[in-house]
Amino acid sequence: KDGYPMDNKGCKIACVINNQYCETECVTVLKGKKGYCYFWKLACYCEGLPNWAKVWDRATNKCRA
């Protein structure tokens, strides 16, 4: 699955232009296929995540940044 990975507060993982950080989060930590910093949203975005990986969803948003 694809989506925005979350931190332990349920918030999207913030980034500015650091694709390497997002790639590490998505591929190494969450076992996805690829990751990058989605510039317009300023958040990491992952592709090819396993079903167990939690991704941000507007309907279930619990982020209290």
Swiss-Prot record:
Tissue: Expressed by the venom gland.
Keywords: Disulfide bond, Ion channel impairing toxin, Neurotoxin, Secreted, Toxin, Voltage-gated sodium channel impairing toxin
Keyword Disulfide bond part of the UniProt annotation: yes
SUPFAM superfamilies: Scorpion toxin-like
Record-annotated LCN-type CS-alpha/beta domain positions: 1-64
One cellular component term from this protein's GO annotations in UniProt: extracellular region
A GO biological process held by the record: defense response
CDD domains: neurotoxins_LC_scorpion
Family: Belongs to the long (4 C-C) scorpion toxin superfamily. Sodium channel inhibitor family. Beta subfamily.
Function summary: Beta toxins bind voltage-independently at site-4 of sodium channels (Nav) and shift the voltage of activation toward more negative potentials thereby affecting sodium channel activation and promoting spontaneous and repetitive firing.
Name the record gives this protein: Toxin Cbi1
Origin species: Centruroides bicolor (Scorpion)
Upper lineage: Eukaryota, Metazoa, Ecdysozoa, Arthropoda, Chelicerata
